[in-house]
Amino acid sequence: MSTVTFDQISEHEQVMFCNDPHTGLKAIIAIHNTTLGPALGGCRMLPYKSEEEALTDVLRLSKGMTYKCVAADVDFGGGKAVIIGDPRKDKTPELFRAFGQFVQSLNGRFYTGTDMGTTPEDFVQAYKETSFIVGLPEEYGGNGDSSVTTAFGVMQGLRAVSQFLWGTDVLTERVFAVQGLGKVGFKVAEGLLKEGANVYVTDVDPETIAKLEEKAYQYPGHVQAVTADDIYGVGADVFVPCAIGGIINDETIERLKVKAVCGAANNQLLEDRHGKVLQAKNILYAPDYIVNAGGLIQVSDELYGPNKARVLKKTRALYDTLFEIFQSAEKKAVSTVEAANQFVEERLQKRARLNSFFSPDNPPKWRVRR
């Protein structure tokens, strides 16, 4: 790995490298911005090809979490953690307990939980070493599976798109192309079928597709499976990416026949400039870090004490935030990416006048779990 310089982390407050030879833990924790409160972000476990690749990922993701926290109006800043390893064979309870010790050493400047390659059960182990864990199973005081709330937030985003483009938030008989049927994507596709929409789907797992096709018989909507490559070119109203990031790029934009892009995947645009490219093609883009903020809202809300009704109320407000950004972009003749980023930066600047970063010596008033 090349030497880490301050230039690489110039936008971040703190980057922590975690190494425990006894358990094999190699992890990086990045804290981007704590203006709003302590950093919050999931921990993913992936077999990165190099430490450099892991660092690039955690820096990018932690910055995205700052924007997501601001847009979701939660009292947290942006952070992220990555564990270098194959989740299929490198996981042990001891590894996650070691990770929990490193989180504890930050003394409340960073809260974490599940992400790609990790599960709530993994963080039950980390919770034995630190209280700064969110997204725990219900039996441990958490709100349970956050994918339910994330999918609910995506549905609110799709309704906001529909209202802005077609003057109604009713999704019946609209056509959607859902890419990825993971924990969130499956629930979104099922929700659309319940609404009476027509849904194209693709996923790497044929069994998951078959499961959705079987469920579709119960609902008024219709589902049709297509290949991973064909999903970009189907005749749909909205493209709904719910898998990997970077899938909106020069090549795929040319193939899209939709009026909007709105989905759960993180970092959907390969580059920010692709927001302008979508705008030039009259394709409305719903910024992903707002659309998929339901899960964040749920796990952050745990610190007030679990309350599912309150979580749904907060998540429902994503509709209004997105609609405001759509209107702002139209009025200013800018892309929705630019409008959303302006929205976030303005809110951060207002809060920065009150406090510039979070210190555990001045704990937030909402902290109820110690």
From Swiss-Prot:
SUPFAM superfamilies attached to this UniProt entry: Aminoacid dehydrogenase-like, N-terminal domain (SSF53223), NAD(P)-binding Rossmann-fold domains (SSF51735)
PROSITE patterns: GLFV_DEHYDROGENASE
Gene3D superfamilies: Leucine Dehydrogenase, chain A, domain 1, NAD(P)-binding Rossmann-like Domain
Pathway annotation: Amino-acid biosynthesis; L-phenylalanine biosynthesis; L-phenylalanine from phenylpyruvate (PDH route): step 1/1
One example of a Gene Ontology biological process annotation: L-phenylalanine biosynthetic process
Active-site residue numbers: 80
Protein name listed in UniProt: Phenylalanine dehydrogenase
